[in-house]
Curated annotation (Swiss-Prot):
Family membership: Belongs to the elicitin family.
Name by which UniProt lists this protein: Elicitin-like protein 1
Organism the protein comes from: Pythium oligandrum
Annotated function: Induces local and distal defense responses (incompatible hypersensitive reaction) in plants from the solanaceae and cruciferae families. Elicits leaf necrosis and causes the accumulation of pathogenesis-related proteins. Might interact with the lipidic molecules of the plasma membrane.
Record lineage: Eukaryota, Sar, Stramenopiles, Oomycota, Pythiales
UniProt keyword Signal, yes or no: yes
Signal sequence, renumbered to the chain: 1-19
Methyltransferase in keyword set: no
Amino acid sequence: MFSKTLVVLAAVAAVTVNGLTKEECDAAFTGEVGKLTKDALPLVQPCSSDSGFSMVPPKGLPTDDQYVKMCASKNCRDLLDVIKKAGLKDCELNFGSVFPGSVPLNVYQLGQGFDAKCASIGGGSTPTTAPPTSTTPTTAPPTGTTPTTAPPAGTTPGVTPSPTTPKPAC
């Protein structure tokens, strides 16, 4: 009896993704892809070129090397932002009917997990800018000496002589 219960639970788990059955996910395929067509489709090819990851047709999840490139790519970051905001269902979308040989891909999880994956592999999902550099170098005076201050540019230290007038020739 216990083993039959386990088999039934395994079967239910195999066809359910976060409360949705495989049939519900398959039925939602066209609508889910439709949510991405307008804004995401123009970014797919540039992201693929930047990263080497094939989202259309999907061959699986990106490798760590592809993730590093995706995290560094503005095209990929923009694409994943569109995916995150699309309101997709948490389903594996089976592209096999459209692209034979492709594998199911959970585009929702790819989008939602992108920032965390970038952080975990050190790719960061947002570009960082270097802090502004100072135009005036600062150095500490050597130990045991009294620091001196240079005069402002264009001035001379000490007493400034008064202007002289030329003396007449003899």
